[in-house]
Regions:
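Histidine/acidic residue-rich metal-binding segments in metalloenzymes
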Residues: 128-129, 155-289, 301-317, 375
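Alpha-helical scaffold segments that flank or form the walls of functional sites
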Residues: 53, 71-135, 156-170, 447-451, ...
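His/Asp/Glu-enriched, well-ordered alpha-helical/loop segment
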Residues: 228, 258-262, 308-395, 411-412
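Histidine-centered catalytic micro-motifs
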Residues: 57-68, 204-213
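Active-site beta-loop-alpha junctions enriched in small/polar residues
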Residues: 64, 122-123, 142-146, 179-183, ...
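Active-site microenvironment of metallo-dependent hydrolases
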Residues: 1-19, 24-29, 40, 209, ...
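Active-site gating loops and adjacent loop-to-helix segments of metal-dependent hydrolytic enzymes
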Residues: 69-100, 138-144, 213-264, 338-354
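Active-site metal-binding motif and surrounding structural segment of the metallo-beta-lactamase
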Residues: 36-55
Length: 480
């Protein structure tokens, strides 16, 4: 099939006006000016997308699709309180609820032009809708324990779980890895145990790192905004007032580096907001890959990752949408635009590398490199997998444009994605899902889930409030 559009953006080479991409089976065979490829391949079926951009699909290096149903429930909260509210809600979810939530997230990812996701959870639920809908995915199993004596068993169980998922999935589009739980909720021996097994077996590893001031203070001083009284469900996921080990007196990056996990080849460190120049030096020395998630960092007041410094240090950087429970959408175009603008507003070298071209690279080939799959995806090149999207520019305020990369970043959004192809298979075409999934049923189930969860969370919040007030009244009577 010959895909034709006004602009073809290979990402790793200059864009082609009036360009074409030849796809056969699951691979890209050729690309170039449309007139030349039509003459060269006269028997090929032609799909002409007109005033559109053809480009590699977005590679989302960090998401939590299982939380999609929670979006809009906890708005305008700082990170620590948002985290607590989300964790309070988790017990209300059944296994089927998590699946319904992940399905609506995967459905929207496809419609947003995302062709590869990297998802972290303890359930691995995202692997199911990814497989159902034809997405490329890496699913990390989250290993979480605050108890040193449980660390080895927890990591061993994680390895067994991802081996089980591999056996069950039966798809070349899915692979699996390990992810330690939050630095503030995980015993450090977990980091060492994961590093040992990952290096030995070549298992991909990702971790949240230096994402908030709360995390930085907890590691350095042992302080925590979450308080002493945490529920059984929250144990391990939230830090109590004092860690079960001595405060490290150093930064999160230095702390985890001392426990060996940054020695895992190609480890993906997500966020890296609370970092200084020494930390960046460690990240560079260890060749740590960065997962940049500007929207959630800004919305939850976590800070802003020093993107320009990462670029200057030569770090590999990919882009992630993170939790839909915070950012509401899986819009990688919005993620690029906001990240670019935040960097220009906060960096002393505003326009050295913070360009539309580099933002587009970060969301495609940069993200592919961050996951170690740049040999397969991330750019339009002969021999690579045919993970391709078409973005409609008819409504672009830059139309007619002399810079299609700028038009995508500054005037498009996820609603302008008109076609999504993964491994040569079209999943979304002319703004309609064609992968065989029942879109209406998925949406209806997600809506019903949101209504039920909202009601149950509201009832639980009222119950907790009554208990807290009763406790305060009892204390007042005692004081009198």
């Amino acid at each position: 099939m010959l895909l034709i559009a006004k602009y073809v953006i290979p990402v790793t080479s200059p864009y082609i006006e009036d360009g074409a991409v030849l796809v056969r089976d699951d691979k890209i065979l050729d690309l170039g000016p449309a007139s030349q490829l039509k003459d060269k391949y006269p028997e090929e079926e032609i799909r002409d997308f007109g005033l559109s951009v053809l480009m590699p699909g977005f590679v989302d290096v960090h998401t939590h699709l299982g939380y999609t149903a929670l979006r809009g429930m906890f708005g305008d909260l700082p990170y620590a309180e948002w985290k607590r509210q989300v964790l309070h809600t988790e017990p209300f979810f059944t296994e089927e609820d998590w699946l319904d939530s992940a399905r609506i997230g995967a459905l929207e990812a496809v419609a947003s032009g995302i062709t590869t996701i990297a998802d972290i959870s303890a359930s691995g639920v995202s692997r199911i809708p990814a497989s159902e809908m034809g997405l490329r995915a890496r699913v990390y199993y989250e290993v979480l324990t605050a108890q040193k004596e449980h660390a080895a068993d927890a990591v061993r169980a994680g390895v067994e779980k991802i081996e089980q998922w591999k056996d069950e999935c039966g798809s070349d589009l899915l692979d699996f890895g390990l992810a330690p739980g939050p630095v503030y909720g995980c015993h450090p021996s977990v980091f060492q145990a994961i590093a040992d097994v990952a290096i030995e077996r070549g298992i991909p590893v990702a971790m949240h790192l230096a994402g908030s001031q709360e995390e930085a203070d907890f590691i350095r001083y042992g302080s925590s905004p979450f308080g002493v009284h945490v529920s059984e469900h929250e144990q391990g996921k939230l830090a109590s007032a004092y860690p079960p080990w001595l405060p490290a007196g150093t930064s999160p990056v230095s702390y985890v580096s001392n426990w060996g996990i940054l020695d895992v080849p190609g480890i993906l460190a997500i966020h890296c907001v609370q970092v200084d120049d020494r930390d960046i030096g460690i990240l560079r020395e260890k060749d740590v890959h960065i997962g940049y998630c500007p929207r959630i960092n800004a919305k939850l007041g976590m800070g802003s990752a020093p993107l320009e410094k990462f670029w200057t240090a030569g770090l590999t950087i990919g882009l992630g949408t993170d939790s839909p429970a915070a950012v509401d959408t899986t819009d990688m175009i919005d993620e690029m635009r906001i990240g670019l603008m935040i960097t220009r507003a906060t960096s002393s070298e505003r326009f050295v590398r913070a360009s539309a071209k580099n933002a587009l690279r970060m969301a495609t080939i940069g993200s592919a490199r961050a996951l170690g799959i740049e040999d397969k995806v991330g750019s339009l090149e002969p021999g690579k997998q045919a993970d391709i999207i078409a973005i409609d520019l008819h409504n672009s305020h830059q139309n007619p444009t002399t810079d299609p990369e700028s038009a995508v970043i500054y005037t498009a959004n996820q609603d302008n994605v008109k076609m999504t192809m993964v491994a040569g298979r079209i999943l979304y075409d002319d703004f309609v899902h064609v992968s065989g999934c029942d879109r209406d049923a998925i949406v209806d189930r997600a809506r019903a889930l949101r209504v039920r969860i909202r009601e149950e969370v509201s009832d639980e919040a009222l119950r907790r409030s009554l208990i807290e007030h009763a406790s305060e009244d009892k204390q007042d009577r005692y004081n009198r």
